[in-house]
Structures are given as structure tokens and as C-alpha cells.
Amino acid sequence: MKILFIPTYVKLDILPSLKKVKIKEERVGVITTAQFIDQLDLICSNLKGSVKGGQILGCNVESAKKILSKIDAFLYIGLGMFHPWALTVLNKPVYILNPEAKEFKKISEKEIEKYRKERKGKILRFMHAETVGVIVSTKPLQYNMEKALELRENIKGKKVYIFVSDNINEGQLENFKGIGCWVN
């Protein structure tokens, strides 16, 4: 079956939400998702001291890394916490603007510390697992079988299986009882 991916953008006037943005740092890297990427130029032209970062995809923060030396903080524009957590590993303050809910906040040091502890726990689970499942998405810009195969080669002393799928949910993963840790 052929799958057609059609980019979809949020139809939302983002300018009223930008009025909520209060950032003390002077140079702010603006990062967003595919749903808001068409408004990135508008956002940056209306935010003093902003540096256009681009799109974040999953936990891939390459667009953020490219502007790291030019900024003092990040402003993530989008929904949810998945993408902002990925930005926290770059050791700059991370602010979040959810234009849909018209909410603005900074991720606190306490929240970051809690996230890092959870992350360490996941790394420990990986270290102790005998069997690892590597998840590869078939979605455009996410499919990277070459990286998965390289990862499998580099993981020593463990059985490594590669799982390829379009959509993944925890319920599906529970069907594979022998996997001690999942890597995405």
C-alpha cells in the first residue's frame, strides 16, 4: 500500500500568544515542530532578539545545535513536552509557548533535574538488559535503518532486534515479552 504524507499546518493566529512571551535572556533560539514551521519567519520577526532555529523532529535536535553558540536560551513553540525535553540536554534555559492553549512557561531546574534522573534510570535499564529492541519509524525524515544497523553493531554483549513500524504505542511493545529495553 502506498502512503501519501501531506504536510499539515496549524491554522492559528500565533501573534496574540507571542505577547505572553517574557524571556530575560537576550538571544533566543526559536524551535518548533512541523505544524508551526510555516509561521517561523513571522514568529522571529515579531520576537526581539530571536534567532531562527528551525524544526525539531522527535528527539533530533540538530537544528537547535546549529544555533547553540548564537543564543542564550531556547523558545519552543508547539504542544506537549516531548520536544522541549530533548532541548534541555543542550544545557540552555528552555521556554515553552503553547499557542493553542495560549500558555507560556519556563522549564524549571527542578523539572530538568527530575527529567535527568528519569533518563539515568532508563540508561541503567538499558545497561542491565540482556535483550534490546531498536525501533525504526518508517515516517519521512525519521526512517534511519542505517543508524539502527550501526547501533546494533555497536551494542556488545546483548541480543539486539530491530523493529520497523509506522506507528508505535506502548501496548504493541508489551507483546514482545523478551525485550528488556526499547531504544527509539
Enumerate the language-model features and the residues they cover.
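Short, hydrophobic beta-strand segments that form beta-sheet elements in well-ordered domains
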Residues: 30-31, 74-77, 161-165, 181-184
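Glycine-rich, anion-gripping cofactor-binding loops and their flanking helix/strand elements
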Residues: 54-70, 107-113, 145, 154, ...
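Short, charged N-terminal beta->alpha structural module
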Residues: 26-51, 135-162
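Redox- and metal-dependent alpha/beta enzyme cores, enriched for Fe-S-associated oxidoreductases
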Residues: 83-160, 167-173
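Short, well-ordered alpha-helix to beta-strand connector turns
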Residues: 25, 70-72, 91, 129, ...
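The feature marks the mature, well-folded catalytic cores of soluble enzymes
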Residues: 1-114, 118
